[in-house]
From Swiss-Prot:
Function field: Cell division protein that is required for growth during stress conditions. May be involved in protecting or stabilizing the divisomal assembly under conditions of stress.
Record PTM text: Exported by the Tat system. The position of the signal peptide cleavage has been experimentally proven. Can also be exported by the Sec system.
GO cellular component, one term: cell division site
A GO term for molecular function: oxidoreductase activity
Protein name per the record: Cell division protein FtsP
Length: 470
């Protein structure tokens, strides 16, 4: 439906004379404390219980919406595990439809990744034991149910997963969860006038909403001590990419990507965050000034009025998070570390090259996902060169592997993209150097897929078999 001149004039009169604004626009102007998901840590001999169930959540002050979540909460607890642990998870499905779950970025064999072969019917459980052998990184877990991933993630089946190791423990960076080390889960939604999320699958492409949410609320703030603050950023949106920056122009110090620390911090004025991508940043709050992270220009009054009549993809507010320093500056403060890893990240020699094509229509290399077809067969312990092309800009993810970006449209990747990754934004062509460190099997393959969740549900998924080392 298009907005006619008559409707615009009528709505303008209503809005200006009566002060009427949509609930989401009103809520965007009210800052709320940042909700910090509870921390669930692995302990030897004790399983981690993850119950997938209905929940209630307040996306806007004074409202309460029926949603999905983990352990009775919209989004789930933050899981923290340690390298060397063998972590037993017990997933329980208390919904009325099938669900499968995965931990994106986890380096484990195919049978432990989730997917169609690990589908949980209503009232069923799945209890994998996950060997944690990878380096410190910020990962995320989410639903990956065939043909239902977009809806289920949108409903709330997602959360952050942290891997720690001796390096992350010893570095002079913030590590007190919920004090100076915060999860920041960014999503966009469309809320009705009662604060309830609306989801209508688009006819093409992926869903984009007009309401920015961080950890489930609009326009949050958090009080922090003066000094360094660590933010673990996750884009859990269905398809929207964000360009993050500080409102006062100070730099974002990037210390980590999808699969762990960069060799050294990288200071940037603007930072891209694609769907499914994770980054860690440090923010210097020692000067005592309040600062906000934003992601572009917010909707104008015309756009907001238009939102009365038709769905909008323009964000009402682009405020991600406000940091409010409190207290005095400590007598001793750590400086930004010069190095995060003792050596540079090295790459091996690829044994073969592949072309991966993501089109405007669903499918990869012209084929829709088929659970009975293996699309790529590789060998554990080897490297390959993948050239990924996309007609429509979108994020691309590979399960069970790590890769390095070698070039983007023929140019070197940005410094913040030169670490180990598993998700990349493709706008044109990117060349990846992929390392296959984990095995998979025909009945338990890895996925490689469009991270536009609706495109994946429509068939933009391939299946990867990695033959184990003999």
């Amino acid at each position: 439906m298009s907005l006619s001149r008559r409707q615009f004039i009528q709505a303008s009169g209503i809005a200006l004379c009566a002060g009427a604004v949509p609930l989401k626009a009103s809520a965007a102007g009210q800052q709320q404390p940042l909700p910090v998901p509870p921390l669930l840590e692995s302990r030897r001999g004790q399983p981690l219980f993850m119950t997938v169930q209905r929940a209630h959540w307040s996306f806007t002050p004074g409202t309460r919406a029926s949603v999905w979540g983990i352990n009775g909460r919209y989004l789930g607890p933050t899981i923290r595990v340690w390298k060397g642990d063998d972590v037993k998870l017990i997933y329980s499905n208390r919904l009325t439809e099938n669900v499968s779950m995965t931990v994106a970025g986890l380096q484990v064999p195919g049978p432990l990744m989730g997917g169609p072969a690990r589908m949980m019917s209503p009232n069923a459980d799945w209890a994998p034991v996950l060997p944690i052998r990878q380096n410190a990184a910020t990962l995320w877990y989410h639903a990956n149910t065939p043909n239902r991933t977009a809806q289920q993630v949108y409903n709330g089946l997602a959360g952050m997963w942290l891997v720690e190791d001796e390096v992350s423990k010893s570095l002079p960076i913030p590590n007190h969860y919920g004090v100076d080390d915060f999860p920041v889960i960014i999503q966009d939604k469309r809320l009705d006038n009662f604060g309830t999320p609306e989801y209508n699958e688009p006819g093409s492409g992926g869903f984009v909403g007009d309401t920015l949410l961080v950890n489930g609320v609009q326009s949050p703030y958090v009080e922090v001590s003066r000094g360094w603050v660590r933010l673990r950023l996750l884009n859990a949106s269905n398809s929207r990419r964000y360009q993050l920056q500080m409102n006062d122009g100070r730099p974002l110090h990037v210390i980590s990507g999808d699969q762990g620390f960069l060799p050294a911090p990288v200071s940037v004025k603007q930072l891209s965050l694609a769907p499914g991508e994770r980054r860690e940043i440090l923010v210097d709050m020692s000067n005592g000034d309040e600062v906000s992270i934003t992601c572009g220009e917010a909707a104008s009054i015309v756009d907001r009025i238009r939102g009365f009549f038709e769905p909008s993809s323009i964000l009402v507010s682009t405020l991600v998070l406000t940091l409010r320093p409190t207290g005095l500056l400590p007598l001793v403060t750590d400086s930004l570390p010069m190095r995060l890893l003792p050596t540079e990240i090295m790459a091996g020699s690829p044994i073969r090259s592949r072309d991966i094509s993501l089109g405007d229509d669903p499918g990869i290399n012209g084929q829709l996902w088929d659970v009975n077809r293996i699309d790529v067969t590789a060998q554990q312990g080897t490297w390959e060169r993948w050239t990924v092309r996309a007609d429509e800009p979108q994020a691309f993810h590979i399960e069970g592997v790590m890769f390095q970006i070698r070039n983007v449209n023929g140019a070197m990747p940005f410094p913040e993209d030169r670490g180990w990754k598993d998700t990349v934004w493709v706008d044109g062509q990117v060349e990846l150097l992929v390392y296959f460190g984990q095995p998979s099997w025909a009945h338990f393959p890895f996925y490689f897929n469009s991270q536009t969740l609706e495109m994946a549900d429509r068939g933009s998924i391939g299946q990867l078999l990695v033959n184990p080392v003999p």
